[in-house]
């Protein structure tokens, strides 16, 4: 018995007239008056289900086959034949059906064969991968992750695993989840009444990381080209379609590189992974184009063939002011560009992906390299039509004296960053990197509007059910 995935049968990799077995779940069952049942069987290996044609001559036809409902798990053995019907090239002429698992009560099965609202699916996140939408998202997520690893491997980067528990606040924003084993009912106190974290597990305050960047820089300053790819955490009380408390980040870091180098790297990487999705997941992308966002495929195709525009922040502000547009957030030099500003630049003005660079120092993090004008830092954002910011990056401040000035200006204790400062004391080099939120990337590719629907189990304010 040859067990094969559904995708192998549908794509002709299982020989016609060969007998194979597929294992999966029933999506639908349709019975004809001629005593034949048609089962749509899916196993997640591709978007489309496989049609299994079941004759009433099978010994368990009356007692089992006719009682199969959506969600039942089965094992189908049969002969691969060319399909006379529309919708698939091949189907399975069943010679045996084995029921592996029944649905207890089909009437109350949360994933009954009908369209469900996206809000309802979040309430049954443990079952929602069985839907067309979330199944397609999961496969695209996988393909993007594999393409990211492949891109960096092919370009000489090393993957570095940075810690999830940290004592450093990379962004200096303070929106971090605390990690502690102290007894909340009996907290140890210092003489001044503050919580005594010296008695905690790590002997100091510890948090879930907001970024692997600082740790990544240490390896870039030894291996030259590295990237991190893992979960990060933000304790922002933001209930928006763009925010998660737990999300995944890709963060490359390159030694002997400047802002122009990583802007070029960002463009190459995005085009590479988008092309991978177009090459490998067209069945899922067609579903997104039909049911979610009609521009899904065309958007990626335009992106991979577009030249990125580049503009200084100062010029971008001038463009926005001169546009005559009325923005919800007024535009002036020194503001952090909002999503509406970013989308105007990418969609209306440049009509292409755009790199905005050299932002005011007061709205950026302490580690970004001060420019010669003393007012701006060598930071960049990549803005994409349809979403706005998709990547944020910078050249890092490699001069110890300037870094110390920035830490002091932002009210951060430089002794807390002693190991980070050591990189500037022992063979410092110019280096640069960026961060890419993986869920925002998936949302952009699929057209799914809310990042809660592109991660298996979203963590948001007041929600950690599963």
From Swiss-Prot:
Main location: cytoplasm
Entry's EC annotation: 6.1.1.22
PROSITE patterns associated with the record: AA_TRNA_LIGASE_II (PS50862)
Pfam name, any one: tRNA-synt_2
Subcellular location: Cytoplasm
InterPro entries reported in the protein's UniProt record: Aa-tRNA-synt_II (IPR004364), aa-tRNA-synth_II (IPR006195), aa-tRNA-synth_II/BPL/LPL (IPR045864), Asn-tRNA-ligase (IPR004522), Asp/Asn-tRNA-synth_IIb (IPR002312), NA-bd_OB-fold (IPR012340), NA-bd_OB_tRNA (IPR004365)
Gene Ontology BP annotations: asparaginyl-tRNA aminoacylation
Enzyme class: ligase
Catalytic activity entry: tRNA(Asn) + L-asparagine + ATP = L-asparaginyl-tRNA(Asn) + AMP + diphosphate + H(+)
Keywords assigned: Aminoacyl-tRNA synthetase, ATP-binding, Cytoplasm, Ligase, Nucleotide-binding, Protein biosynthesis
One annotated Gene Ontology cellular component of this protein: cytoplasm
Superkingdom field: Bacteria
Gene Ontology molecular-function annotations: asparagine-tRNA ligase activity; ATP binding; nucleic acid binding
Subunit structure of this chain's protein: Homodimer.
Protein family: Belongs to the class-II aminoacyl-tRNA synthetase family.
The protein, known as: Asparagine--tRNA ligase
Organism: Serratia proteamaculans (strain 568)
